[in-house]
Amino acid sequence: QSGFNWSVVQKKWPGFEEAFHGFDLGPNIFMSDDEFDEHLKNTAIVRHAKKILSFRDNAIFLSDLAKEHGSAAAFFANWPVDDLVGPWEVMKKRGSRLGGATGQYSLRFLGKESFILWRDVTAVLISAGVIEKPATSKTALKAVQGALNDWKAESGENMTRISRIVAMSVG
């Protein structure tokens, strides 16, 4: 759903599933130029060239992770929760259009215990002196991870719950 209005994606979801073979990696890895051109004409999906190409690129990325780690799911599931910035960096570097909030939401949708830097979470982190502005640099992201690790240790709660509580504590 990267960069799209979520309600638009939800309405077009059946079209995406059909066009991209139920999200089976194999056919998407080998998307031909002709198939790509057909996707650009397909009114059942959002016709954005770079995002359509990202299906192929991310199918390759996930397939590579599977070869390296047994499965892409194992790669993400086994990544330590005290370093959630790590898989975000991997997704940004090796995936296509998976940086920023997209990577954060991806982990959450995969069921990975994680945090999301919503506007309200960022406001709390700034107010607490953890960061000075929205965290985009590696240094700032590591500071955020450190603060959330501390809150996890102090509270005994998981990262997802902490992230949600922090988000609801302002606004």
Put a short name on every predicted segment.
Residues 1-23:
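A positively charged, amphipathic N-terminal helix/segment that binds anionic biomolecules
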Residues 5, 12, 51, 117, ...:
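Hydrophobic (often cysteine-bearing) scaffold residues that line and stabilize catalytic clefts
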Residues 7-8, 50-53, 160:
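Short, solvent-exposed positions on alpha-helices
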Residues 13-17, 56-63, 145, 149, ...:
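Short, amphipathic alpha-helical segments that act as regulatory/interfacial helices
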Residues 15-19, 38, 46, 112-113, ...:
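A short structural micro-motif
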Residues 21-97:
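Alpha-helical ds-nucleic-acid-binding substructure associated with the helix-hairpin-helix region
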Residues 76-171:
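C-terminal accessory module of base-excision DNA glycosylases/AP lyases that mediates lesion recognition
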